């Protein structure tokens, strides 16, 4: 999973965001910020994992941001994030080629259904990882 020495950000408050946030925390990956369309919905999650809540446009540009949003929302959320920010999204059905050109864009897709209500460890969950460069792909592994 993503390098534990560098903080990350998460966008989203649904099933995948919640499960990944706790998995990252349990793997000692620091989540510095969590953002969502409405900041009210992420306050409890952010507090649980020790993250700050921010607007999508305010996400740090120097760390990986994981988009845990619906497939349809990915293009519009990407437009709100600084184009230099490294981003990975959690959809297996949205092609990298269909999205805006960015230096660091990737897919970080868990090959298992995740739900907020069911606590689980992700150590045995396979992830599909793809990126627009080999260098960035290696950062997501």
What is each PLM-predicted segment?
Residues 1-55:
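NAD(P)+-binding Rossmann beta1-loop-alpha1 motif at the extreme N-terminus of oxidoreductases
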Residues 9-10, 67, 129:
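Hydrophobic Val/Ile/Leu positions in short beta-strands of Rossmann-like dinucleotide-binding domains
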Residues 89-141:
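Rossmann-fold dinucleotide-binding core
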Residues 2-3, 60, 122:
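Short, flexible coil/linker segments at domain boundaries that flank nucleotide/cofactor-interacting
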Residues 43-47, 59-61, 78-83, 95-103, ...:
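Short loop/helix-cap segments at secondary-structure boundaries that form the rim of catalytic
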Residues 57-79:
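Rossmann-like NAD(P)-binding element
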Residues 34, 53, 87, 105-107:
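Conserved beta-strand scaffold positions in the cores of enzyme catalytic domains, especially
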